[in-house]
C-alpha cells in the first residue's frame, strides 16, 4: 500500500484563502467604522466645547455689566449698553489686575454676527479715539441667526437697547439670547442681569 502524500489540495487552499479574505474584509470594515465614529464624536465634541466656551465668555461679559457711559470717536456720549441690528456693545467690569496697575477694571466689549460667525472684540480703552476700530475674533461658527431681547423695567422684551428716552447708564433687568445653530436648531439662554 502506498502512503498518502501530506499537504493540501488546491481546493483546500482556495477555501482557506477565501475564509481569510472574508475575515480580513470584516476586520477592515470594523476598524474603518470605528475610526469614522471616532471622527464624528471628535467633531461633535469640538463643536460642543466651542459652544460652551462661547456661552461662558458671553455670560461672563453680560453678567458683569457696568453702568458707565462711553464716548465715541467724535466725543459724543454713548450709552453703556447698545444693542441694535445684530450688534452689541457694552461696558463690563471684572478685568483682572493682578499687578495692581493704576487702571480701571472696566472693558469695552463688542459682539456681532457676520457670515455665520459670532465675533467678539474687547478693549480696555472705553472712550474711542478717531480711527479706532475694534479687532474682532470669532468665538463661534455655524450661527445662522442671533437674537438678543432685553427686559426693561416695565417687564417688556425689547429687541433694541436702550429704549427711547432712557438715560445713558440705563441697564436692562434680563437678557434672552437665541442662537440658530446649523445642524442643531435653536438654542436659548436667559440671564438675570445685575
What residues fall within each predicted segment?
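N-terminal single-pass transmembrane signal-anchor helix
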Residues: 2-31
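Conserved acidic
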Residues: 19, 50, 135
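Intrinsically disordered, low-complexity regions enriched in Pro/Ser/Thr/Gly and acidic residues
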Residues: 93-171
Amino acid at each position: 500500500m502506498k502512503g498518502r502524500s501530506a499537504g493540501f489540495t488546491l481546493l483546500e487552499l482556495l477555501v482557506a484563502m477565501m475564509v481569510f479574505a472574508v475575515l480580513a474584509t470584516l476586520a477592515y470594515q470594523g476598524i474603518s467604522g470605528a475610526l469614522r465614529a471616532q471622527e464624528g464624536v471628535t467633531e461633535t465634541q469640538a463643536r460642543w466645547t466651542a459652544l460652551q466656551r462661547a456661552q461662558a465668555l458671553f455670560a461672563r461679559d453680560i453678567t458683569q455689566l457696568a453702568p458707565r457711559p462711553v464716548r465715541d470717536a467724535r466725543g459724543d456720549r454713548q450709552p453703556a449698553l447698545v444693542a441694535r441690528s445684530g450688534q452689541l456693545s457694552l461696558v463690563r467690569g471684572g478685568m483682572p489686575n493682578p499687578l495692581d496697575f493704576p487702571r480701571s477694571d472696566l472693558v469695552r466689549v463688542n459682539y456681532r454676527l457676520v457670515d455665520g460667525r459670532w465675533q467678539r472684540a474687547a478693549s480696555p480703552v472705553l472712550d474711542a479715539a478717531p480711527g479706532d476700530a475694534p479687532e474682532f475674533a470669532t468665538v463661534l461658527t455655524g450661527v445662522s441667526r442671533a437674537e438678543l431681547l432685553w427686559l426693561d423695567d416695565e417687564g417688556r422684551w425689547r429687541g433694541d437697547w436702550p429704549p427711547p428716552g432712557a438715560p445713558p447708564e440705563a441697564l436692562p433687568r434680563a437678557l434672552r439670547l437665541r442662537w440658530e445653530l446649523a445642524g442643531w436648531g435653536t438654542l436659548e439662554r436667559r440671564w438675570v442681569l445685575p
